[in-house]
Regions:
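Catalytic cores of the polymerase beta-like nucleotidyltransferase superfamily
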Residues: 1-403
Length: 403
C-alpha cells in the first residue's frame, strides 16, 4: 500500500491531530490512491464537531457547507477541502436523504453508512489504512460490493443503484452478485430520484472506457423508459466502439437513443432536463444518415455546409461504429472534412466570394429569388463546376437571374 497524502490535506489532518481529534482522508481519494490514480478531490473526516473545525481553522477560511450534516469546507492554498464529522444516519423516508444524522466518535461507524466497500476506507499517516469492510481486497479482486446489507444501502439512497454501475464501468470491475440482485430488485425506487441526478450519473456512466456491459436493461427501464425493451446488445457494442471520455458522451448518447429517432430523442432528453446544447447535439447525430455515395469531397462539403467540424467528427465516429465494414470510408470522410476546414474551403453560402448585396447590384431582385441564386452559386462551387471567385460567380448569377 502506498498512499501519499496531498500536501494541503496532510496539513489539515496534522492540525486536527495536534488539536486532539482523530482525522482521516476518506472515500474516493483513498480508493484512487490505492489504485495508483491521482485523486481529484481530497475529502476528510474527523471526530471534531463542525463548530470545532471552524474554531480550529478560523471562520475566514471556512465555508459552512452543510453544518446540519457535519460538513465544513476549508480553504487552503487555493483549494477547497470538505471536512465532515464522523456520523451515522437515520432513516431515509424520501429514498435519497437521511432524515437525521448523529455525530459519533468512531470512524468505523462513519464508514458503515457508506455505499460500497471500495469507497468505505479511511487513511491517516499515524494510523494507516482503516478498512473494516474489505475494500482493499475488493479493489484487488476488481469487485464493487455494497457495505453491509445491499438492500438497505439502496433503500437508503436509490441513486446508489446507478452509482454501482458507474463505478463498475469506470474501473472495469465486476459487480458482486448479491449487490446487483438488490439493485435490480429496487430499481423502481429510482422514480424518487431527481432527473438531474439521473442524467448526471448516466453521463458519467457513458463516459467510461467500455460502458456497454454495464447498461443493464432492468435498470435502464426505470431511467430511460422510452427505450424499446428489446435486447441492448447492438447498442452496447456500438457504444463500446466509440471514443471514450466526457467530451465524447454526446456520440454515445446518440448510439443509445438511435432507435427513438430525432423526435423521440428530443423528448427523452428534455424529460431528463438536459441542456439545449446536449439535446440539439444528440438529436443532430440521431437524425443524420450516413451517405450512400463514395463522392468523398462532395459529401464532406455537404456535411460542413450543415454542421461544424466537431459534429462531423462525431457523426463519422458514430457511423463507423454502426457500420464497421465502412469504417475506412468514414475515416477518410472525416479526414477530408478536416482538410477542407483547414483550407477554409467554401461549403456554405456565407463563404461565397459574393453576398446578397453583390447579386442585387448585378441585377438579381431581392426576395426568395435572391436566396435561390446564392444557393445555386454554392452548388456550382462545391461540385467544382465554378471557382469561388467573384467575377465568375457574378457572371453565373446574371445568367441565373435571367432564366
Amino acid at each position: 500500500m502506498n498512499i501519499v497524502l496531498e500536501p494541503g490535506a496532510s496539513a489539515l489532518l496534522d492540525a486536527l491531530h495536534r488539536a486532539g481529534f482523530a482525522a482521516y482522508a476518506v472515500g474516493g481519494c483513498v480508493r484512487d490512491s490505492l489504485l495508483g490514480l491521482a485523486p481529484h478531490d481530497w475529502d476528510l473526516c474527523t471526530a471534531a464537531r463542525p463548530e470545532q473545525v471552524m474554531e480550529l481553522f478560523g471562520e475566514k477560511q471556512c465555508i459552512p457547507t452543510g453544518l446540519q450534516h457535519g460538513t465544513v469546507t476549508v480553504k487552503r492554498n487555493g483549494r477547497l477541502y470538505e471536512i465532515t464529522t464522523f456520523r451515522t444516519e437515520g432513516s431515509y423516508s424520501d429514498g435519497r436523504h437521511p432524515d437525521s444524522v448523529a455525530f459519533v466518535p468512531d470512524v468505523r461507524e462513519d464508514l458503515a453508512r457508506r455505499d460500497f466497500t471500495i469507497n468505505a476506507m479511511a487513511y491517516s499517516a499515524e494510523e494507516g489504512l482503516c478498512d473494516p469492510f474489505g475494500g482493499q481486497e475488493d479493489l484487488a479482486r476488481g469487485v464493487v460490493r455494497a457495505v453491509g446489507e445491499p438492500l438497505r444501502r439502496f433503500e437508503e439512497d436509490a441513486l446508489r443503484i446507478l452509482r454501482l454501475y458507474r463505478f463498475a464501468a469506470r474501473f472495469g470491475f465486476v459487480i458482486d452478485e448479491a449487490t446487483e440482485a438488490a439493485a435490480k430488485q429496487l430499481a423502481a425506487h429510482l422514480d424518487c430520484v431527481s432527473v438531474e441526478r439521473i442524467e448526471e450519473e448516466l453521463n458519467k456512466l457513458l463516459s467510461a472506457p467500455k460502458p456497454g456491459a454495464y447498461l443493464e436493461p432492468e435498470v435502464l427501464a426505470f431511467v430511460l423508459p422510452e427505450l424499446p425493451p428489446d435486447d441492448l446488445s447492438e447498442a452496447r457494442e456500438i457504444i463500446d466502439a466509440l471514443p471514450a471520455g466526457a467530451e465524447e458522451v454526446t456520440t454515445r448518447w446518440a448510439a443509445l437513443l438511435l432507435p427513438l429517432g430525432e423526435d423521440g430523442t428530443r423528448k427523452a432528453l428534455k424529460r431528463l432536463k438536459c441542456s439545449n446544447a446536449v439535446i440539439d447535439g444528440v438529436s443532430t447525430l440521431v437524425k443524420e444518415k450516413a451517405p450512400r455515395t463514395p463522392a468523398l469531397s462532395l459529401q464532406a462539403k455537404r456535411l460542413l455546409g450543415k454542421y461544424d467540424l466537431h459534429t462531423v467528427q462525431q457523426l463519422t465516429a458514430l457511423w463507423s461504429a454502426l457500420r464497421p465494414e465502412r469504417k475506412d470510408e468514414f475515416t477518410a470522410l472525416q479526414k477530408e472534412a478536416e482538410t477542407l476546414t483547414a483550407q477554409s474551403a467554401c461549403c456554405r453560402v456565407s463563404q461565397l466570394a459574393v453576398n446578397g448585396r453583390d447579386l442585387m447590384a448585378a441585377g438579381v431582385a431581392p426576395g426568395p429569388g435572391l436566396r435561390r441564386a446564392l444557393e445555386a452559386l454554392l452548388e456550382e462551387v462545391i461540385t467544382g463546376r465554378l471557382p469561388n471567385e467573384k467575377a465568375e460567380l457574378l457572371a453565373f448569377a446574371a445568367k441565373f437571374s435571367a432564366s
